[in-house]
Amino acid sequence: PAVFGPLYPVLQQIKQAFDPLNQMNPGKIAGPSLMTIDGVPLRGQSDRQINPATRAAYAPALSCNGNGACFAQSAAEVMCPSYKATLDRRHSPKGRAGLVREWLRQGGPDGRADPVFERQVKEALDGCLSCRACSRACPVQVDVPSFRVKFMEAWHRRHRRPLRDHALSVLEPMLPLAARVAPLFNLTVSLPVMRWIGLHHLPRLPADTLDVPVLGRALPDPAQAVIIVPDAFTRYFEPALVADLATLIRAVGKEPWLAPYRPSGKPLHVAGRLGAFRRTAKRQAALLTRLHESGFTLVGIEPAVTLAYGDEYHEAVGAALPVLLPQDWLAGVADRLPAPLREGRARLLTHCTEGTLRPDAGEVWSRVFAQVGITLERPATGCCGMAGTWGHEVRNAATSARIFAQSWAGQVRAEVPVLATGFSCRCQTQVQAGVVLRHPLSHLAERVQVSMKVT
């Protein structure tokens, strides 16, 4: 028939005129006109429509080459927890990078992107746990959290922030006051209004007090002192853990001192409040730089906060701050710890951000524990599903539980003590499995105290 002969190109022209994107019954009856080899659109053509300054600011999004390594589904793979839980490619680093790429092409940072599409981009980025796995596990290091926060900053210039954002943003500066009225704080976070705001399973403040001296105007001898840099989570929700680190500092013949508490700004950064984060980071950096220049050793506890001093702070204040993870400091003094009384075993689960930014973190812990006669099991795990405050948001509840079930659920019960370095990981395990995990510092301090009493 003529329709498949001379008239077919005419049908193709009609199809092209009325359905230029080939969205209606693609491939049925007539397809669009064939493209020439040099007419196939390439990624670079779209990228060149983005102005150079914006391309530089969002370089990690534009670096995605589509290799698809982020589609791994193994529970032992750290990348990407949100994709493994949803199997939705929009919730993978590749999907998010592609969406942000198109948002940039449309002029999103200047408010010129299609509003319906822009909301879809936000939904994809809301699902990101900011675990940083993609920043190292991706072959081209597509760092989704780095451009996620910039998108959120641009989005909230034009859209009101939800109450949960405001509540989480004031958490760090509010905690010193809240700790003075802990029963009132605990009552407040247990009220139904918190779920209405969009938050649940919030931790409670303990009645414990912290008996570690705080630095004042008169500074101790830097050669004898070790400064604990407090973070909001362990300082106020787990003061006993800070005391355990102080015990270990004393065990090696040093004096523990607590740096004056200052907010780190980590929750501000995750929320895309970059201006407020920079101001907070500069204040904290001024204090820590002064202490470092005075010759003090600085040690943090919470991995996500401690690592932020060398990562997010580098961009915010132009320098990485030398705050050590606890195992890094312990590794240098472990030979001074009391000799072990007996051999033992334990299982260690590291915070996903810690394992990503410091792949050797678990190995360093193993060396430290070996000095006190403990062999550490270090099973490969992904994210626990809490990721700071992400799992505390009601909207993320189902995905958070699914992520935990895929990886951590099978590791938190064992015949040996199970230890976890992340505060949010310990919270998540208690919420999802009803299991209370200890920090490795607490297990180590207990072991050392027993040895010291006997000897």
Name every feature range the model reports, one short phrase each.
Residues 19, 26, 33, 145-455:
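Iron-sulfur cluster-binding electron-transfer modules in prokaryotic oxidoreductases
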Residues 1-127, 146-160, 169, 183-184:
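Ferredoxin-type iron-sulfur electron-transfer modules and their immediate structural context
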Residues 51-75, 115-131, 253-261, 372-382, ...:
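Immediate flanking context of iron-sulfur cluster ligation sites
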Residues 2, 52, 126, 135, ...:
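Conserved aromatic-histidine-acidic binding/catalytic patches
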Residues 71, 77-78, 87-90, 135-141, ...:
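Cys/His-rich zinc-coordinating "finger/knuckle" motifs
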Residues 103-107, 130-133, 137, 272:
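Short His/Asp/Glu-rich catalytic/ion-coordination signatures at enzyme active sites or charged loops
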Residues 64, 70, 80, 128-134, ...:
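Short cysteine clusters
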